[in-house]
């Protein structure tokens, strides 16, 4: 942690969150932001809270203690990481129907979900020949890294997951009543909600990785690690390597897809303008706009470097 001034905290909790308390917490957090260098994204809904915040350690501690006053702290899932730089520009607080959008209102993860499996037990579970492993993240996240032999539902967003379950899950099960279903995601929230969906549909033996990939990478030594590649994250770092340091991926600012060092060497790649994923998605006029935007970004970087040197 030496030299790393920013504490990055991912958190979520499923619990009944009353509307008046939602706005009360939001206002208190905005007051903290006004007086401190607090950034991140928080989502509030009647089903709970979800998000990631970034600030100096003492500020994060204040925020977490405040959030615990509104939640059942026993069910508040927290994952901590550190960075030399801010990973968000500012604090955004959004109030939505769901803290992670699935679009199935009849499920209730705070009352009915699968069995948590901690990092120590995960390897044994997924090596079991009677277990199928499902990555509940989006296809572009999975392209950056995933667990060995896991199933990719190839979804563009989490709201497509229920349809994948209806259309495809049974084709992966030899026996619906006896096969273990192990699910995982970045920090635990999507796979937890996915287990609630499957239980509602009558599936049995449903498990999810407690704390998600990030907790697993923090807990498991590299020589025992079954995760392959890097872990996509929704901030400026883009992806984290297996030591939870900033990885090798960047973002195509035209389409938002994660791109590797190898991707940037492809002939289709033009920084800030296009990559091989989106070369056919945009018009020439779009690319001209992207080119002007990239020129402005480059000019600002040069100017900022001059200011910092002075």
Swiss-Prot record:
Question: What name is this protein filed under?
Answer: tRNA uridine(34) hydroxylase
Domain annotation Rhodanese: ranges: 127-225
What's this chain's function?
Answer: Catalyzes oxygen-dependent 5-hydroxyuridine (ho5U) modification at position 34 in tRNAs.
The text of the family note is: Belongs to the TrhO family.
The protein's UniProt keywords, in alphabetical order, are:
Oxidoreductase, tRNA processing
Q: List the disulfide bonds.
A: none
Give the EC number.
1.14.-.-
Q: Which NCBIfam families match?
A: PRK00142.1-4
Q: Name one GO molecular function term.
A: oxidoreductase activity, acting on paired donors, with incorporation or reduction of molecular oxygen
Q: Which GO terms describe its biological process?
A: tRNA modification
Which Pfam families does the UniProt entry name for this protein? Rhodanese, UPF0176_N
Catalytic residues (UniProt): 185
Classification lineage: Bacteria, Bacillati, Cyanobacteriota, Cyanophyceae, Synechococcales
What is this enzyme's catalytic activity, as reactions? Answer: uridine(34) in tRNA + AH2 + O2 = 5-hydroxyuridine(34) in tRNA + A + H2O
Recorded hits in SUPFAM superfamilies, A to Z, give: Rhodanese/Cell cycle control phosphatase (SSF52821)
